[in-house]
């Protein structure tokens, strides 16, 4: 009997908290200072936030001068120079933006954080991050499957095609959604991650995200994710359709409604779910990996 390995197996002793890991301030190319950015996210009910200025590390000590507004603030930055952009989340110090991105990934890991690749389908050629690099690098947590700012730039804000190609190759990677906010108006509240956090501290948020105990969203709320034998159930507040996909991004089931309960198809190597709401509201579960 195949085994379903997934990140939602122990949802006890914590609570779901929404947050964003990709945002900019006037320290790099953002239009607002740190406190204005923090205030905006807090006013929208976010539970955690990372300031990720380009190659400018924001430490936990740096945050002490600001009012966190009851949010958990996460150290990090966007590694930008010398190659495709990456998020550095939760490490204890600045990491040099080496052109060899594997070295960046390794240095972040050594310093207690995790890394992910940003907006892979940015630019007119949809290739900000060459796929060969995504395939060759090891030890990163995942990639942005949605990046809000790319909606108004060239390329696609979505990266699920890259995700599915990597998952189909057997990689175990998480999908993240972020604002990548820069502008003073219109860049916040586009994409976020909803993590099940047990320890409400920076370390606790980093642990939840690095272990994949979250879903990515642009507006759909997931209420329940459960595995029972060979069946997976997803229940939402506001999805109009839920689609189940397997390797190669092949759809094997869908339901027009807010919930779905499907049996894992024979021979599947992974399964994931996309929850479609109205307009541009989506939610994406993390993959369920099938081991024979």
What is each of the regions a protein language model found here?
Residues 1-16, 170-174, 179-292:
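C-terminal functional module detector
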Residues 2-120, 124-139, 145-165, 169, ...:
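A metal-dependent hydrolase metal-coordination microenvironment
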């Amino acid at each position: 009997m195949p085994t379903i390995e997934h990140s939602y197996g122990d949802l006890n002793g914590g609570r779901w908290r929404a947050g964003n890991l990709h945002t900019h301030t006037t320290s790099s190319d953002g239009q607002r200072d740190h406190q204005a950015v923090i205030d905006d996210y807090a006013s929208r009910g976010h539970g955690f936030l990372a300031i990720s200025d380009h190659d400018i590390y924001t430490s936990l000590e740096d945050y002490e001068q600001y009012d966190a507004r009851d949010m958990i603030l996460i150290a990090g930055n966007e590694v930008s120079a010398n190659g495709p952009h990456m998020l550095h989340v939760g490490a204890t110090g600045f990491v040099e933006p080496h052109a060899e991105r594997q070295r960046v990934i390794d240095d972040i890991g050594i310093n207690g954080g995790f890394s992910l690749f940003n907006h892979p389908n940015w630019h007119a050629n949809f290739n900000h991050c060459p796929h060969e690099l995504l395939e060759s690098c090891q030890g990163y947590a995942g990639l942005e499957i949605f990046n809000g700012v790319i909606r108004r730039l060239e390329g696609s804000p979505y990266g699920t095609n890259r995700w599915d190609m990597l998952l189909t190759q057997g990689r175990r990677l998480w999908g993240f959604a972020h604002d990548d906010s820069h502008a003073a108006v219109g860049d916040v509240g586009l994409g976020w991650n909803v993590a099940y956090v047990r320890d409400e501290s920076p370390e606790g948020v980093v642990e939840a995200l690095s272990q994949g105990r979250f879903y990515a969203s642009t507006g759909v709320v997931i209420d329940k994710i459960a595995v029972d034998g060979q069946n997976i159930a997803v229940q939402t507040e506001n999805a109009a359709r839920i689609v189940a996909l397997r390797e190669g991004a092949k759809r094997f089931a869908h339901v027009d409604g807010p919930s779905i309960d499907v049996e894992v198809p024979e021979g599947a190597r992974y399964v994931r779910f996309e929850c479609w709401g109205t307009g541009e509201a989506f939610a994406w579960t993390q993959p369920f990996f099938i081991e024979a």
